[in-house]
Each structure stands twice: as C-alpha cells, then as structure tokens.
Amino acid sequence: RVRSSAASDVYKRQVYVLPDKAIGKQACPVVYLLHGYGGNARSWVQLKPELPQMADEKGIIFVCPDGKNSWYWDSPENPAYRYETFVTSELVKYTDGNYATIPDRKARAISGLSMGGHGALWSAIRHKDVFGAAGSMSGGVDIRPFPQNWEMNKQLGEFAANKASWDAHTVVNQLDKIVNGDLALIIDCGEADFFLEVNKDLHNRLLARKIDHDFITRPGGHTGTYWNNSIDYHVLFFDKFFKK
C-alpha cells in the first residue's frame, strides 16, 4: 500500500510483481502498467497470468496501480482525484524507496490499456524526467470524440461547456512537450478497435513532428485477448530500451 495525499483514499492498493532478482535485492528496472476504465490494480495480473514469469525472465519489476476511473489526470473538477501526481510522483518515489529499483528514467517505463494507454502517454509526455519509455495499447489518445463515455465528464466537466479543458487533457495535444529522442514510444491498436482512428491520428502527428516511435496495428478489437498479446510486444520493447 502507498500512502497518498493526491488520491482520495488514504491508502491506494497496488500490485507489485517482483522478479527473483529484486527479491534478492538486485536492482531492476520498473514498468508501470495502468489498467483501463472499470479496472483495478489486479486487472493486469488477471489479464496476463504469466506476468510473474515475464518478470523473472526479463528481470523487470511490474507495478500495477489502482487508478479507479480517473483517466490518470489531476482532475480540474474533482480535487480528490489527483492521479497524475499520484502515479508520476508519489508512487514512483514509494516504489524506489521500498523496492530494489534502478531509480533513473532510463530504467523506468509506463504503459497501459485503453484508459491506461491514454494515462501512460499522458504521464510520460508530461513527466519525461521520470519516464524514459512509454507505451499505449488501444489507448484513448484523443478523448474528444467520446464526450459521453467512461465518466470523463466527472473529471473534466461536461464537454459542451468545457471544450478548452477537454482540449487540454487529451494526449494528441501534448506533443509540443516532447522532441525526438525524449521518449522511446510504442503504440498499438487493433484494426477493429473503436480507438483505431484516434491512434492513427496520433501516429500521423508524431510523424509530422519527426518523433520516432513504433506503431503497430494488428487484427483484433478492444479485448483482453488483444491486450494479452500486446503486452508481449511492449515488454520486449521496454527490455531493449533498458539494455541500451
């Protein structure tokens, strides 16, 4: 458990998946995995039961926080929901202070699915001093086409009356904060996913800014089967980044 002043609960439950190396106090890199809307801290280990085996094989610590339905923002409408601060500051400091990590952005990555894909890119782009690599699986990287969905209006206010806030809280409008080389990026989305078009738009915006990134589309939808496959690509990408 992590004591948090940024999130409404005094304690936020997290799930830590530790490789044997870390249990033996040998310092390891860390991948933060963010769940989607309706999920919780256990979502990733339920979706990918092989996560402990992957941790051992790669020598990576996986940290799976409970982000509720926050979209990982510091909500301008809900002062109790400061999940950007929680994930990028409090949780990272707690993890580095209590586990055998390599406390450096070059050994720290973040990824997630759906809401968590948005959250991972949002967190990394805005805190490139904290994370060296980031990924998104089926991420809601432009929220504006979906103004009535997934309780986003609880965090940002109703879209019609708060368009400027919605513009400011969408990933595709954060790209001015990075230049090529700031982050190692991997983005993927299924060909049958309702987020496919916003992910293609993000890809094109990154190309226009000449920001290197891996962009993958594969057959599949917005499903656990797709993400169970996606995580393998992301862990491979992050492992290569950590070993540079």
Predicted regions and their residues:
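A short loop-to-beta-strand scaffold at the N-terminal edge of the catalytic core in hydrolase folds
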Residues: 9-21
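Short substrate-entry loop that stabilizes the transition state in hydrolases
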Residues: 23-28, 33-72
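Single conserved hydrophobic/aromatic residue that forms the stacking wall/gate
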Residues: 1-7, 11
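The feature captures the conserved acid-bearing segment of alpha/beta-hydrolase catalytic domains
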Residues: 158-205
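Primarily recognizes the serine-hydrolase "nucleophile elbow" in alpha/beta-hydrolase
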Residues: 97, 103-152
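C-terminal catalytic histidine-bearing segment of alpha/beta-hydrolase fold enzymes
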Residues: 192-244
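Alpha/beta-hydrolase active-site loop
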Residues: 78-99
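Cell-envelope and extracellular/periplasmic
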Residues: 35-38, 139, 188-192, 220
